[in-house]
Amino acid sequence: MCVLSIDIETFSDVDLTKCGVYAYSDSPAFEILLFAYAFDDEPTAVIDIACGETLPHRVLAALEDASIIKTAFNAQFERTCISRYLGRHLSSEGWQCTAVQSALLALPLSLDAVGEVLDIQRKKLKEGVDLVKFFSMPCKATKANGGRTRNFPEHDPEKWERFKTYCIRDVDAEREIRRKLQKYPIPDSEMELYRMDQEINDRGILVDQELVSSAVLCDNQYREMVTARAYELTGLSNPNSPAQIKSWLADRGVETESLDKKSVKSLMAETDGEVLEVLKLRLLMAKTSVKKYEAIERSVCSDGRVHGLLQFYGANRTGRWAGRLVQVQNLPQNHIVDLELARELVKNCLLYTSDA
C-alpha cells in the first residue's frame, strides 16, 4: 500500500494555540508556505509554495485517493490546512496520524519528544521554533524592519533555506518514528473511532454569536459596576487585591488568612455594614466567569461554528478524549426553568433585571 508522508509550514494572523487549527486556517491571511512530502521510501522533497512553486499532480491525486495512506504527526493539522488551501474538504478516510499511534503506546504527544524517547537518528531540528516564529507568525513593526508586520522569504533568504530544511526534517522524523512503531499498528477499532473524532471536529458546533458577545459585554459592564462600588467603599487603589482587602479588613477588626469563597462566607456571617457589603462585592467580583464565551469568540469560524473541540487520545495514558479550546465537557448542568428569558435578557444586556 502506498504511503504519502506530509509536513507543512504555514502562516496565519490567528493564534494557533489559543484558537485551534480550524480558526487558524479559516483566516483570510492563512497560507501554506512549504509542503514537504515523501512517497514510501523515496527521498523527501519540499515544494516552496510561498515562492510560487505548485504541488505536483502526483501529490494532488494522492490527496484525493483514499487508497493511498496519508500520514503526518498530528494529521488533523495537515488535513485541515490542506483542505483550506485546496478549497475543498478532504475526508479523514485514508489519513493516519503518527501522533495518535504514539499516544496509543503512552508516548509523548509532540514530534520532538517522541523522537527523543525513541532515539531516532533524524530528530526534529531545535532551531525550528525560532524559524516558525520568524516566518509563520506576524512580526512587530519597527524602524529596523521598515515597519513591516510579516517576514517573507526575501527578508532573510538564508533563514528561508533553513526553514525548508526544517520542514523536510519533520517528514524524515515522522517516517522514522512510524517505522519504529510499525510492529504496533493502530487497531481497526481505534481507527474507526479516530475517523469519527475527525468527523465530529470537522462538523463543529453552531454557536449563538449574539449571545456570546452579549455575555462578554455584560460581564465587563457588571465587573465595572461592582468594582466601582468597591472603590467607593474602600478607597483602595485595587479592591481586587487580596493583600489590600485583608489590610482594609484588619483596620476594621476583621482578621483572615484567606479570602476564598468559604472564608468570605464565614466572615459574612459575623459582620455587617460596609464590611459585609465589601465581602459581598468580593464574592461577586470572583463569581462570574465568561472564559468559555471568550474562548468561543476567539475560536469561532466564518461558518458560525467552533471546530476542534476534542483531541483524540489527548489523555494518552488513559486513551480518553481531551477537551480543547472551550472545554465543552466541563459545562455545568443547566436547570434554569426560564432559560429562554434569561438568554434574551443577556442578549439585551439587561444587567439589573437578569441579576434579580
Predicted segments with their positions:
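Active-site-proximal helix-loop-helix substrate-binding element of RNase H-like nuclease domains
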Residues: F30-Y37, D41-Q182, V337
